[in-house]
Amino acid sequence: LKIIPIVRLATRFSPEKNSWIVPNRKEIINQLDFLSGLTWPTDKKHIIVYNEVNHASEWGGRVDPEEYSRILKFVSDWARTEEKNYIILPAAMDLAAPNGHSTLEAFNYLSQMYKFDPDIFSYIDIWNSHSYPNPGFSSVPTKIGKNSLRGFQYDLDFLKSKTGNDYKVMITETGWKENAWNSKWLESYYTYAMQHIWSDERVIAVTPFLLKGAPGPFASFSFYDADNEPTNQFYAFRGALREI
């Protein structure tokens, strides 16, 4: 078994703000020092610089592309101060989020990052995408659009238009929310995705959401239940792997 860790940086959740706090520089340095002190099973150390920051709940109760840009640049610069072989991925956007008080549409957010710092995307090595079959995490895999399994393609097209560069991508969240309607189709959905979408040569990793989320609000996505028994999601995914 070969494990390639993809570690997402996180902070503390503030019940008062009902959001994850924004890290300061000292906290970032401590996080990177901690990670540098670990024994990694790979030479390259893949880290994701926080999560879905186009949600206020993920960023101190506010949506702030400029502040996140500064943090992303600082993490990238600091991670490269030593020969630690860090590979930087940005926070994935929630591609289904609208423009509003507590969220910002993904490409609006990314455009504001680019406007603030036209070099911002040069501080990342690999793109990071959350490409879900929306709406409701339960659409068919053949759907096309930024809110579909093909969302990463819209990410990469945006980057190409701004930088002229072709990025590789890791899809670090994707998959279906199982329900009574799609339960019997999950294996065929995963098979289609593997054969026709995730086979894109620019995709270098796909990590479905999630291994174990039961009990809790993510139980219907989970590959293992609360008793550590495989779920229908597990068997559907395994069956799809056998088809390719």
Residue ranges and their predicted role:
Residues 205, 209-213:
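Eukaryote-biased recognition of C-terminal alpha-helical segments
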Residues 51, 176, 213:
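Histidine-bearing beta->alpha loop at or near hydrolase active sites
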